[in-house]
Amino acid sequence: MLKEEDKIFTNLYGQQSYDLKSSQKRGDWYNTKALIDKGRDFIIDEVKKSGLRGRGGAGFSTGMKWSFMPKNSEKPCYLVVNADESEPGTCKDRDILRFEPHKLIEGCLIASFAIGANTCYIYIRGEFYNEASNMQRALDEAYKEGLIGKNACGSGFDCNIYLHRGAGAYICGEETALLESLEGKKGMPRLKPPFPAGFGLYGCPTTINNVESIAVVPTILRRGASWFAAIGKPNNTGTKVFCISGHVNKPCNIEEVMGVPLKELIEKYAGGVRGGWNNLKAIIPGGASVPLLPKSLCEVEMDFDSLRTVGSGLGTGGIIVMDKSTDIIYAIARLSKFYMHESCGQCTPCREGTGWMWRVMMRLVNGNAKKNEIDTLLNVTKEIEGHTICALGDAAAWPIQGLIRHFRDEIEQRIKSFGIA
């Protein structure tokens, strides 16, 4: 359980104002110049020592990612913050953007300094109108007070931060598709290599980080890497904002330690499963793109490694709870439709496969299929997984794989009830 004094996002519910003065009372922008004066190597080393792993889903070491940037680049360097939060069941970054914008802006300044970038872009989801408005007001305040811009915080470092609104494409949450969109092109993922650290925005060295990953950096530097590393579990350190939605009594966002038991999160903060824990059917633990877990596995600890051992993943930390009233086959079919709709169409396995999977899933929903089609569907998901430029193909395949792994009997019963053997 996270102690009150260890919380990083103290205004996650918007109970206080998000303006500069209120944010400073909560500790934001405190002696930022002193943190910058410690130098780039110190900042990167502290972030590495803290064990901070990317909070956008991949879980890659944030400090390690920063260290890939060239030290003496002839080209300008860029920091890009991925605020294109579009994963079904995920809304953690949304609350940070609207209620804790100054934490993000301060984090952008420090991260930009650490990687040698004088320009930062915050790419925000197009539908986040109010969040974009709050962010822009916060940026205007920071510029007015000299916290960012020329000679930011009196540090001698120039850093301009710009807000760029997306246009509603889920695929632009993929880092290279996001860069394409920023450049004014159609949001389609790039082949890697080259990686963004060598050839990113406008062909220049670029680091792309998630909102939460950047927003926690100032607090880590103030309190020390050892403080952050002592929270959570080895290799899964610090705090994490979890989103709990679906069939719970009180849907909410909550900051807790990495490794907190899934059942404890739901019982303590979300008022429990609707109808009690025994009424639980399944949980998607990390946003729509990770495989679901049946009730028997739902007391797992919420961290990257523990969830991997049970065949799922932490992803974004978006917990979707489904009780026994759920048509689990239709629920996953609905996700299949989402991924079919959001595929950019660049890769054949994803372009053709997502539509094919959705059509088969809808037949399974009705039971109008043959039993051998279950294995055919599973085989197709494995042909898509790992055979596309970006991870959208994997994201479309994994929910179906989880469904077949844990609820094959229910699919077969649906087919039997329809009357086709």
Curated annotation (Swiss-Prot):
Q: Which cofactors does this gene product need?
A: FMN; [4Fe-4S] cluster
Enzyme Commission number, as recorded: 7.1.1.-
Binding-site residues for FMN, renumbered to this chain: 166-213
Q: Which SUPFAM superfamilies match?
A: Nqo1 FMN-binding domain-like (SSF142019), Nqo1 middle domain-like (SSF142984), Nqo1C-terminal domain-like (SSF140490)
Reaction equations catalysed: a quinone + NADH + 5 H(+)(in) = a quinol + NAD(+) + 4 H(+)(out)
Q: Tell me the residue numbers annotated for binding NAD(+).
A: G54, R55, G56, G57, A58, G59, F60, S61, T62, G63
Presence of the UniProt keyword Iron-sulfur in the record: yes
Cite the entry's keywords alphabetically. Answer: 4Fe-4S, Flavoprotein, FMN, Iron, Iron-sulfur, Metal-binding, NAD, Quinone, Translocase
Protein origin, superkingdom? Bacteria
Check the record and name the InterPro entries matching this protein.
ComplexI_51kDa_subunit, NADH-UbQ_OxRdtase_51kDa_CS, NADH-UbQ_OxRdtase_suF, Nuo51_FMN-bd, Nuo51_FMN-bd_sf, Nuop51_4Fe4S-bd, Nuop51_4Fe4S-bd_sf, SLBB_dom
Quote the record's cofactor note. Answer: Binds 1 FMN. Binds 1 [4Fe-4S] cluster.
Recorded hits in Pfam families, A to Z, give: Complex1_51K, NADH_4Fe-4S, SLBB_2
Annotated residues that bind [4Fe-4S] cluster are located at C344, C347, C350, C390
The record's GO molecular-function terms, alphabetically, read: 4 iron, 4 sulfur cluster binding; FMN binding; metal ion binding; NAD binding; NADH dehydrogenase (ubiquinone) activity; quinone binding
Please state what class of enzyme this protein is: translocase
Job description of the protein: NDH-1 shuttles electrons from NADH, via FMN and iron-sulfur (Fe-S) centers, to quinones in the respiratory chain. Couples the redox reaction to proton translocation (for every two electrons transferred, four hydrogen ions are translocated across the cytoplasmic membrane), and thus conserves the redox energy in a proton gradient.
* Family membership: Belongs to the complex I 51 kDa subunit family.
In its UniProt entry, what is this protein called?
A: NADH-quinone oxidoreductase subunit F
Q: Which organism is it from?
A: Rickettsia prowazekii (strain Madrid E)
